[in-house]
């Protein structure tokens, strides 16, 4: 009997335990590798800003680095369309084999890329192009892996089985942080010169292993059954988004599930790292170590909440996570500030910093295309304060008034960097978080709470998304809202939040972005999202 016939014969039955384990392991390992590749850039954003955006000031360079990071997210929905269509037409297995090769090659090339000092403006242009290739590949990876695992999972265990795919993003982040820390340790002062390239070059080894394992997989039984019955879609994109009954479900998935889930995930694993290092001035090595510890503690909960969704439903778990995110983000991040840099907290209470300026001279420093110039005295003052991690408030001055900075009782006219440094030093503002004063246990506890919230939203996600759509258009239909949510809502979280902080001076103001998104998702989900755990995905 042929392999095709053997697989087809089991299409309507559950997979064996050994086959299920192999499917989960092979799919998850490859997805861990893709997330490792994708997250490396985020872990090295500060270094990359110096290597590839050297022609601008430090704050603008960091914003550009975040924008390049976000560029990979922008194209993810397009990857979802391209590879989703292929996955629904030619099969799940071969499609997500292509995505892993594309991701691995693009990441390896980043490790070989000359810097701005070597080839000038071509360096950031090529970097962004490679980031976009990574995003294109990741746009096709998740839908393929989630669909493939779910279509092999026995009824009643889809949440548990697909939650392993959900945990891969966290494991990929953990792997990237561990590799970066190891490279920092072994290369020392040379890390920012050439050592940062090693994590990117190392990806070629992971690519070889992941590709070899995926080559041994068989096609999804549900897909083969559909093909044998002649029910495969000839135009999955048109069918997914051109028919209102399907488009309506896509929109519900985007606004009730993916938008909110995305910001909870990136708040817990990306924005928190930016917050600790950029605004609270924690030593990057310590911040990475505390995040690693938190991720190790939090990772199993992605599996737990996937399992729990098999017992009580997908919707209750997801809605609880969104509710907690909306209610707790401000208290959690204020707690991080208190336990990370108490000296900064005390100084800001005793000698608050106020920037008095004509609002027309102050720019909102969000520049997706890199053409704006932030060089007014107001912009320079705010850039300096944010670069130093100093919280401040803004006050409007009459039109045409020069900028004035107050540090407690000290007044400084215009942008005078020396005078500003002297004033903040006199007021007791620390230049960095004192490692001895960081309450490491409480920082880990608060990050773990963020991860638990993310796990509630992310753990049941793959099963829920697979169950919403029919087999013939499943890959395409679930991939697009997922990657719009994660690529746009989540991917721009660090950049938008950072720009909000620069504009207002309030290090917590950027949290309004995730709070609003999770709040909207909560309301839409409560009224529009249906429960799906009992759906028969083989026959819908």
How would you label these PLM feature ranges?
Residues 210-217, 332-339, 516-540:
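Multi-pass alpha-helical transporter architecture, strongest
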Residues 45-76:
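Extracellular/periplasmic helix-loop-helix junction of adjacent transmembrane segments
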Residues 113, 119-139, 343-357, 440-456:
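Hydrophobic core of transmembrane alpha-helices in multi-pass small-molecule transporters
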Residues 66-85, 104-106, 171, 292-305:
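Central cavity-lining transmembrane alpha-helices of secondary-active solute carriers
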Residues 54, 101-120, 323-343, 426-435:
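C-terminal ends and interior cores of transmembrane alpha-helices
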């Amino acid at each position: 009997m042929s392999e095709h016939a053997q697989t087809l014969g089991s299409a309507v039955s559950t997979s064996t335990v050994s086959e299920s384990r192999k499917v989960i392991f092979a799919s998850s390992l490859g997805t861990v590798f893709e997330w490792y590749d994708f997250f490396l850039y985020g872990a090295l954003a500060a270094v990359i800003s110096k290597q590839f955006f050297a022609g601008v000031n430090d704050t603008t360079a960091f914003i550009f680095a975040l924008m390049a990071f976000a560029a990979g997210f922008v194209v993810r929905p397009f990857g979802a369309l391209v590879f989703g269509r292929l996955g629904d037409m030619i099969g799940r297995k071969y499609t997500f084999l292509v995505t892993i090769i594309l991701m691995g090659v693009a990441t390896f090339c980043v490790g070989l890329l000359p810097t701005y000092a070597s080839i000038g403006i071509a360096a950031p242009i090529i970097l962004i192009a490679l980031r976009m290739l990574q995003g294109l590949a990741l746009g096709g990876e998740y839908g393929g892996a989630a669909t493939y695992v779910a279509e092999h999972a026995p009824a009643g265990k889809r949440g548990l089985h697909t939650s392993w795919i959900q945990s891969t993003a966290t494991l990929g982040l953990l792997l990237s942080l561990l590799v970066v820390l190891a490279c920092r340790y072994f290369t020392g002062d040379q890390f920012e010169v050439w050592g940062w390239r090693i994590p990117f070059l190392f990806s070629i080894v992971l690519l070889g292993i992941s590709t070899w394992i995926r080559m041994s997989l068989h096609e999804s039984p549900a897909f083969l059954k559909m093909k044998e019955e002649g029910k495969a879609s000839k135009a999955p994109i048109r069918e997914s988004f051109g028919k209102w009954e399907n488009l309506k479900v896509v929109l519900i998935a985007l606004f009730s599930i993916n938008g909110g889930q995305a910001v909870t995930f990136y708040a817990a694993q990306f924005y928190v790292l930016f917050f600790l290092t950029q605004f609270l001035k924690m030593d990057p090595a310590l911040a990475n170590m505390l995040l690693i510890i938190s991720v190790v503690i939090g990772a199993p909960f992605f599996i737990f909440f996937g399992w729990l969704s098999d017992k009580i439903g997908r919707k209750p778990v997801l809605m609880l996570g969104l509710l907690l995110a909306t209610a707790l983000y401000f208290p959690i991040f204020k707690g991080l500030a208190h336990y990370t840099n108490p000296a900064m907290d005390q100084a800001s209470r005793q000698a608050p910093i106020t920037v008095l300026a004509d609002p027309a001279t102050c720019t909102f420093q969000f520049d997706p295309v890199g053409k704006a110039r932030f060089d007014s005295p107001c912009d320079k003052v705010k850039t300096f304060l944010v670069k130093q991690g100093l919280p401040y408030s803004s006050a409007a001055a009459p039109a045409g008034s020069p900028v004035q900075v107050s540090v407690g009782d000290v007044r400084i006219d215009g942008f005078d960097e020396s005078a500003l440094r002297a004033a903040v030093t006199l007021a007791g503002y620390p230049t960095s978080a004192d490692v001895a004063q960081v309450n490491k246990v409480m920082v880990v506890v608060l990050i773990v709470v963020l991860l638990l919230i993310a796990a509630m939203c992310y753990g049941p996600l793959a099963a829920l998304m697979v169950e919403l759509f029919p087999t013939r258009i499943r890959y395409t239909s679930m991939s697009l809202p997922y990657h719009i949510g994660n690529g746009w809502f989540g991917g721009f979280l660090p950049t938008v939040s950072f720009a909000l902080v620069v504009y207002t001076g309030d290090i917590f103001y950027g949290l309004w972005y995730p709070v609003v998104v999770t709040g909207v998702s909560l309301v839409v989900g409560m009224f529009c999202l249906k429960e799906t755990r009992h759906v028969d995905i083989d026959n819908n």
